[in-house]
Amino acid sequence: MTKTFRTLDDVDVKGKRVLLRVDLNVPMDAGKVTDTTRLERVMPTITELSGKGAKVILLAHFGRPKGRDDKNSLKPVAAALADVIKKPVGFADDCIGEPAAKAIAAMADGDILCLENTRFHPEEEKNDPAFVAKLAELGDIWVNDAFSAAHRAHATTEGLGHKLPAYAGRTMQAELVALNKALEAPVKPVIAIVGGAKVSTKIDLLENLVTKVQALVIGGGMANTFLHAQGVKVGKSLCEKDLAPTALRILDKAEAANCAIILPVDATVAYHFEANAPSFAYGLDAIPDDAMILDVGPRSIERIHAAIDDAATLVWNGPVGAFELTPFDKGTVEAAKHAAKRTKAGKLVSVAGGGDTVAALNHAGVADDFTYISTAGGAFLEWMEGKPLPGVEVLQVK
């Protein structure tokens, strides 16, 4: 990802038909958009292109339709987008063919048009060359501003980059710059915090991180698997016992790479998985057989703080406890607040991503204090795993 990629600074868009791939996959309830975060994220690129006199043609998917399906139409999303950007947004009820061509032909410079859900055509996800060619006829250049879909080699996220001059939008550019700063060319030492329920979903991520960071904090349910692998009795806690050999392999790999692994040294446990259940802090040698670990304990929180203090860069994915239940949010909230404080003091570059992580940082009230928050989900994880992202690769200057 340290390779260079073309941005909007490299192209004159006046009078050009710009096919702009955006992420409009917003939550809906009864035909109304309930969270406009993703619409706000695409606003800078749309308004810049429109202001420079481009004909801005939006391409996006919505949901997982099997063919045309009105409840996955982008029409209400286009209306919500118009409210957010405070500009009219036209709508065409297909993304190819006559409806799209006619609507585009009627555009004036600076106009914005949203084409219908690209996934109404199964060829979108197959990256079908004939479908890509039909889309390419509608534009002069392609701008990808959907990092969240960059791990998919679909027609509108990757295929168009082989047919039209390709550029990164401002949201994509910001994401690539932030991620590059965090793992590819970071200020060292780098610490990663990885939490969440299961090791099984994050094996590739852990194996990549131990070769890139100087310290790795493992928390959440997945820490129990590592503790079990080391002979700790974890009671009724969530634990993937069959992955003990995998956990030991990751620990060995970390040691060989000189990456310090920071596991819990104590735990906050309860007998019931529910909010405000009576909870107790125990050392790892005393976890009751009928209790479950739901958060890191007070000494573990101190260790996480110390690790953050020693770091210049932090990459975070996944909560370190059952943060959705009080009081088992304490470890995650305190670590988040500590990282935010260091960031605000100019002592830490902090990058976080993944759905649960963003929710946890919002819950802690510190999301705005991190250097960068990625809303990308799957693409953020694949980047952390060190995998090439097709929608980014195609933007790079060869």
From Swiss-Prot:
Sequence positions that bind ATP: K202, E324, G354, G355, D356, T357
Gene3D superfamilies, sorted: Phosphoglycerate kinase, N-terminal domain
GO terms classed as biological process: gluconeogenesis; glycolytic process
Chemical reaction(s) catalysed: (2R)-3-phosphoglycerate + ATP = (2R)-3-phospho-glyceroyl phosphate + ADP
InterPro entries named among the record's database cross-references: Phosphoglycerate_kinase, Phosphoglycerate_kinase_CS, Phosphoglycerate_kinase_N, Phosphoglycerate_kinase_sf
Signal sequence, renumbered to the chain: none
Enzyme's top EC category: transferase
Residues that, per the record, bind substrate: D23, L24, N25, R38, H61, F62, G63, R64, R119, R152
The protein's Enzyme Commission number: 2.7.2.3
Subcellular location(s) of the protein: Cytoplasm
A Pfam family reported for this protein in Swiss-Prot or TrEMBL: PGK
GO cellular component, one term: cytosol
Keywords: ATP-binding, Cytoplasm, Glycolysis, Kinase, Nucleotide-binding, Transferase
Molecular functions per Gene Ontology: ADP binding; ATP binding; phosphoglycerate kinase activity
Pathway of action: Carbohydrate degradation; glycolysis; pyruvate from D-glyceraldehyde 3-phosphate: step 2/5
Recorded superkingdom: Bacteria
HAMAP family for the chain: Phosphoglyc_kinase (MF_00145)
Oligomer status and interactors: Monomer.
Family listed: Belongs to the phosphoglycerate kinase family.
Name the record gives this protein: Phosphoglycerate kinase
